[in-house]
């Protein structure tokens, strides 16, 4: 909107200091609708009137208004083209503009989308479960992303945090940011978190939500297990893992786990010891005794990994990242917003009431940001 302001000031003088004897005057504003490649958008159009030689005033057509409409449309086309893999120079040739204008359009629109992504109020989300995962846009650049599932089965991408690795400090900074934005998780009930085997994520969760139910992703468990077994034993291990994924409740889960552990113990001692040490994380969800129709949703981190896969299609095009700018944040903001456009409710969402009931605690817990910060200080 600065373009409009600059042109009006040029014609009429600065606000509250009109040009003496000038032919132009301000005539207020009016809401107008402009059309872009994404649809329509309302802006406040400045109006200017000019005194003619016959003593009558006429509306002045502002050049900046047409330029804003052109730029709005161009920014959206630049965004779409770059996200679909086009180069900056190629987009410039397609739109008939210079490479610098393409760069300007991309930066402007991606900053708007990042502000939109991080400007949302998280306090209205009734969080039932959360998933956390990291994506590596560069060799020394990691972005940790948090996704929430509410009590109605809707998925919400919450925020992300940049770092050099998926460390506990990076994950804690992300959780602190979510708290500061109003995320009210783990208060009305315990929080269910499905995660990979990362010790960093587990540590951060214990600080912010000490009684959270931490479920290890069984896809990661299976992957690690098969890596330790010989090829001829992998098929049977996968079959027993599939049984564990399918059964319902604590008792059936315990039986399926013991069957798997017995099989692995006879094939690889190190794999069996590792599996047994992770038993509580592997069976955490089964011990809630909820319908097995929810297993496919909460026994793996597939929901957030699908988001990460889509995000890599966007950020994977960048060969060199500039840590001194907001480049990583802008690209990730765009990638995550685009990934969220295709979200649907999770499978088994009609059974989430039973999960919410299973996560209830007898009394409220003090899980505020202040108490979490105090715990972090003690650990340090």
What would you call each of these model-derived segments?
Residues 224-248:
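Conserved phosphate-handling catalytic cores of large alpha/beta enzymes
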Residues 10, 17, 24-27, 35-36, ...:
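RNase H-like nuclease fold core
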Residues 4, 133, 155, 193, ...:
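Residue-level signature of catalytic and energy-coupling elements of molecular machines
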Residues 71-85:
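Short, amphipathic alpha-helical "recognition" segments used to contact nucleic acids or chromatin
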Residues 5-9, 14, 88, 246-380:
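Acidic/histidine-rich catalytic cores and adjacent linkers
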Residues 209-229:
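Inter-helix linker motif
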Residues 92:
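The alpha-helix within a helix-turn-helix
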């Amino acid at each position: 909107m600065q373009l409009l302001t600059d042109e009006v000031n040029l014609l009429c003088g600065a606000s509250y200091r009109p040009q003496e004897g000038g032919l132009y005057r301000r005539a207020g504003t009016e809401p107008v609708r402009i059309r872009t490649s994404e649809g329509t958008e309302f802006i406040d159009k400045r109006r200017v009137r000019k005194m003619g030689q016959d003593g009558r005033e006429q509306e002045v057509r502002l050049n900046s208004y047409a330029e804003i409409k052109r730029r709005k449309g161009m920014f959206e086309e630049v965004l779409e083209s770059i996200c679909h893999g086009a180069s900056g120079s190629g987009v410039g040739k397609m739109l008939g503009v210079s490479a610098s204008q393409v760069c300007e359009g991309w930066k402007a629109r991606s900053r708007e989308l990042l502000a939109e992504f991080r400007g949302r109020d998280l306090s209205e989300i009734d969080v039932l479960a959360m998933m956390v995962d990291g994506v590596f846009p560069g060799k020394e650049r990691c972005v940790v992303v948090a996704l929430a599932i509410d009590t109605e089965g809707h998925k919400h991408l919450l925020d992300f945090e940049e770092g050099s690795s998926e460390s506990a400090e990076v994950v804690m900074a992300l959780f602190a940011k979510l708290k500061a934005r109003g995320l009210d998780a783990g208060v009305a009930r315990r929080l269910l978190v499905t995660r990979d085997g990362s010790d960093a994520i587990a540590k951060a969760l214990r600080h912010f939500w000490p009684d959270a139910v931490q479920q290890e992703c069984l896809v990661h468990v299976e992957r690690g297990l098969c890596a330790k077994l010989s090829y001829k034993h992998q098929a049977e291990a996968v079959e027993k893992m599939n049984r564990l994924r399918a059964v319902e409740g604590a008792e059936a889960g315990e039986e399926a786990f013991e069957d798997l552990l017995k099989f692995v113990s006879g094939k690889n001692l190190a794999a069996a010891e590792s599996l047994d040490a992770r038993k509580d994380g592997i069976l955490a969800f089964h011990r809630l005794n909820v319908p097995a129709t929810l297993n496919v949703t909460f026994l793996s981190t597939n929901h957030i990994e699908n988001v990460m896969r889509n995000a890599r299609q966007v950020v994977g095009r960048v060969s060199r990242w500039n840590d001194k700018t907001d480049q990583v944040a802008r690209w990730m903001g765009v990638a995550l917003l685009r990934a969220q456009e295709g979200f649907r409710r999770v499978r088994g969402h009609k059974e989430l009431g039973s999960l919410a009931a299973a996560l209830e605690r007898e009394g409220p817990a003090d899980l505020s940001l202040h108490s979490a910060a105090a715990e972090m200080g003690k650990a340090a």
